[in-house]
């Protein structure tokens, strides 16, 4: 009797967000977990989410710079793996808190800290199970002009200023104003 393959549905990073799913404004960051600048940006994002609440949706997309941060790729994969169990944001914040210690064994410990009980977590990391999802993020980032993280977009427009609370707030406020000015869609007969 031939063995049957198990079909596994993978939740992509594009489907992992926090905030209001139907918000008219999406803040998207391309970042990585070993970068000091990305860690600072993560703190700014926390302030932004506190300020805007359900007026926006935030997505983090992976852009590990493996030439200078060798462990950033596996860290990104571990975040995607955590997302499969609904623990992406818990793992995301733990990775930034521990950005100087992102070896595979540490990632396994952080997964427990995030509340992940998946016995296959380490196997998935070692086997690169979620590597394609991270590579897809990198590819899309390159297509959008991302060169070095952190890079932010508000409704698909790159924020070219330094990602401070003030600069991101201005970009979000502008997008919120634009979304209010749009005429209501006409119903088809």
Model-derived regions, located:
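N-terminal targeting signals for export/organelle localization
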Residues: 1-7, 186-189
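Short clusters of hydrophobic/aromatic residues that line enzyme substrate/ligand-binding pockets
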Residues: 17-18, 102, 159
């Amino acid at each position: 009797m031939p063995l049957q393959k198990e079909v596994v549905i993978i939740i992509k990073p594009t489907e992992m967000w926090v905030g209001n799913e139907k918000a008219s404004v999406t803040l998207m960051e391309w970042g990585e977990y070993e970068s000091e600048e990305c860690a600072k940006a993560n703190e700014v994002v926390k302030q932004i989410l506190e300020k805007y609440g359900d007026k926006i949706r935030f997505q983090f997309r992976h852009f590990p710079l493996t030439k200078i941060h060798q462990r950033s790729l596996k860290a990104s994969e571990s975040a995607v793996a955590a997302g499969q169990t609904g623990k992406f944001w818990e793992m995301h914040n733990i990775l930034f808190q521990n950005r100087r210690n992102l070896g595979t064994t540490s990632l396994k410990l952080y997964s427990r800290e995030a509340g992940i009980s998946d016995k296959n977590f380490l196997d998935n990391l070692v086997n690169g199970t979620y590597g394609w999802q991270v590579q897809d993020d990198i590819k899309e980032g390159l297509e959008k002009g991302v060169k070095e993280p952190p890079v932010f977009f508000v409704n698909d427009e790159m924020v070219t200023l330094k990602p401070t609370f003030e600069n991101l707030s201005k970009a979000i406020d502008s997008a919120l104003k634009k979304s209010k000015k749009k005429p209501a869609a006409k119903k088809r007969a």
